[in-house]
From Swiss-Prot:
This is Pyridoxal 5'-phosphate synthase subunit PdxT. Keywords: Glutamine amidotransferase, Hydrolase, Lyase, Pyridoxal phosphate. The active site is at C82 (nucleophile), H173 (charge relay system), E175 (charge relay system). It catalyses: aldehydo-D-ribose 5-phosphate + D-glyceraldehyde 3-phosphate + L-glutamine = pyridoxal 5'-phosphate + L-glutamate + phosphate + 3 H2O + H(+); L-glutamine + H2O = L-glutamate + NH4(+). Pfam families: SNO. Pathway: Cofactor biosynthesis; pyridoxal 5'-phosphate biosynthesis. Transmembrane segments: none annotated. CDD domains: GATase1_PB.
Length: 192
């Protein structure tokens, strides 16, 4: 059976998410990936990716485009990266961001500081046999994970990957670099 994935397409690395999910779904007939710009675009989706970008901008645009409540109430799985991790939290250290409260966790924006402090590292992620090349770009970290949240990866700065039910959130960018293992883990989790 096909899987329908939407990518919130207001700002950020939308094209990279669409390409990664298309590749991850290539062997699933009837699957599709589409950009999401309006509330009605969420209908019939199995999953939604909330991309990296600027969390304050995405938060503002979600409100302006009438997407905040529909995304907060979305019943499918959510795959959130970088700014998406910030938005998916229930508590954020920046009052300019209106969190969606999809995952009970506290997130600190831009925990890595300036762009120059961004980095790549080989990261041990629970459930993966081999380390994952994680690209951190002005990344957030979760400073606290609530009840029912499975911490999948940590670095000295904090928690950088979590799962909560059918939702997954990452401080880094799994859509960059061609390693689709986390996309596949997420898609398999939709079937549970």
């Amino acid at each position: 059976m096909g899987v329908k994935v939407g990518v919130l397409a207001l700002q950020g690395d939308v094209a990279e998410h669409i390409a990664a999910f298309r590749e991850a779904l290539a062997e699933r007939p009837g699957s599709s990936v589409a950009p999401i710009r309006r509330a009605e675009d969420l209908a019939d989706l199995d999953a939604l990716a909330i991309p990296g970008g600027e969390s304050t901008t995405i938060s503002r645009l979600m409100g302006k485009n009438g997407l905040y409540e529909p995304v907060a109430e979305f019943e499918g799985g959510v795959f959130a990266t970088c700014a998406g991790m910030v938005l998916s939290a229930d508590r954020v250290d920046d009052p300019r961001v209106r969190p969606l409260s999809l995952i009970p966790m506290h997130v600190a924006r831009n925990a890595f500081g300036r762009q120059v402090d961004s980095r790549e590292t080989m990261l041990e992620v629970a459930g993966l046999a081999e380390p994952f090349r994680a690209v951190f770009i002005r990344a957030p970290v979760a400073t606290e994970a609530g009840d029912g949240v499975e911490v999948l990866a940590r670095i000295p700065e904090g928690i950088v990957a979590v799962r909560h039910g059918r939702h997954m959130a990452f401080a880094f960018h799994p859509e960059l670099g061609g390693d689709l293992r986390l996309h596949r883990v997420f898609l398999e989790g939709l079937e549970v």
